[in-house]
From Swiss-Prot:
Keywords noted in UniProt: Hydrolase, Nucleotide metabolism
Native source species: Methanopyrus kandleri (strain AV19 / DSM 6324 / JCM 9639 / NBRC 100938)
Purpose: This enzyme is involved in nucleotide metabolism: it produces dUMP, the immediate precursor of thymidine nucleotides and it decreases the intracellular concentration of dUTP so that uracil cannot be incorporated into DNA.
Name by which UniProt lists this protein: Probable deoxyuridine 5'-triphosphate nucleotidohydrolase
Pfam families named in the record: DCD
PANTHER family, sorted: DCTP DEAMINASE, DEOXYURIDINE 5'-TRIPHOSPHATE NUCLEOTIDOHYDROLASE
Example GO BP: dUMP biosynthetic process
Source taxonomy: Archaea, Methanobacteriati, Methanobacteriota, Methanomada group, Methanopyri
Length: 154
């Protein structure tokens, strides 16, 4: 079952009014990073992320160069209830503009900043203002779910 706007208003009462949607909440762009160096996912739990270099804004606007992967850090920090999972979906304006946003599932009990990968597939740079809504979080009730015990949240 997808949690609707009125349930989400109770769970997240401090959002801006424009973040509440009928079937989710919009997350806003906070910080942007370029990936540098090598990462790896090896046997067992051997994970190595590439280095992240923060991208500065020009007058509050980030510029995504063509065919470069960027990590977008979103606001606000989320605390996902233990009986809920979250699907993160890109805003359709980005897709219609040639910017793909790659996401993952938010596990029950995860708490922290959400980061997604974005790639501008257009030939020209794409500009996004700090604080713009870029991803919609859709909350799904998860029966008999375990709790998040990964490396990236608290």
């Amino acid at each position: 079952m997808i949690l609707g706007e009125y349930v989400l208003r109770d769970l997240f009462p401090d959002l801006d009014e424009d973040q509440y949607q009928p079937a989710g909440i919009d997350l806003k762009l906070d910080r942007v990073f370029r990936l540098e160096g090598r990462g790896a996912l090896l046997e067992g739990d051997d994970k190595r992320l590439p280095e992240y270099r923060e991208v500065e804004t020009e007058g509050g606007v980030f510029e995504l160069e063509p065919n470069v992967p960027y990590v977008l850090e979103l606001a606000p920090e989320l605390e996902i209830p233990e009986d809920t999972a979250v699907l993160f979906l890109p805003r359709s304006t980005l897709l219609r503009s040639g910017v793909s946003v790659h996401t993952a599932l938010g596990d029950p009990g995860f708490r922290g900043k959400i980061r997604v990968l974005a790639v501008n597939h257009h030939a020209a740079p794409y500009r996004i203002a700090h604080g713009e809504r870029v991803v919609q979080a859709v909350f799904l009730r998860a029966e008999d779910a375990g709790r998040y015990e990964g490396d990236y949240g608290r």
